[in-house]
């Protein structure tokens, strides 16, 4: 299956994310190795907009980097454009809308993975159907039965873990017990968990 490479851009938290091709397409609609001019122009527009919001003008490359003999802005640093990285829940919501799930979102931080799940839950995203929720509960109950005591389940915040699974979300990292990672892998393989926020512990 060919790998489609896209970039999701969001101007701010109040606007819908935009999905743009990373590379240009040829006359046959196939991606080339050249960067998409539309993407470059869009990012440039956002940079200029961010600079205006800060009361700064984007420096003209022909004139150096702005004020002062050093050719730089305040404190000797070139002005930095704001990042245009969409919120994680917004990325998931857009991918779901486009029918591009299940998916894996790699985050190189255990806390980052857990926080991403919470962000999606708090945003009210639900990626599963009633039928899928029933299947998730059955599989989770089967895998947990006899493996952990009630005290263990409480200490591991099992109810929170299970609720996220039922909504279609999961973390996967070395800070989780092996059983929880196995549950996530099983549900993802069966297409029941739609988005996994993972560190390098999840092999493709």
Model-flagged regions — what are they?
Residues 1-119, 163, 170:
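Conserved interdomain linker/interface between the two RecA-like ATPase lobes of SF2 helicase motors
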Residues 1, 197-204:
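Ser/Thr-glycine-rich phosphate-binding loops at phosphate-binding pockets of nucleotides
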Residues 150-200:
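Conserved helicase ATPase core of P-loop NTP-dependent helicases/translocases
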Residues 120-162:
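Alpha-helical "lid/cap" subdomains adjacent to substrate-binding clefts that gate access
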Residues 36, 127-129, 177:
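Ser/Thr-centered flexible coil motifs
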Residues 112, 178, 203-204:
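Glycine-rich nucleotide phosphate-binding loop and flanking beta-alpha elements
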Residues 96, 121, 188-189, 203:
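Signal for well-folded cores of large energy- and translation-related assemblies
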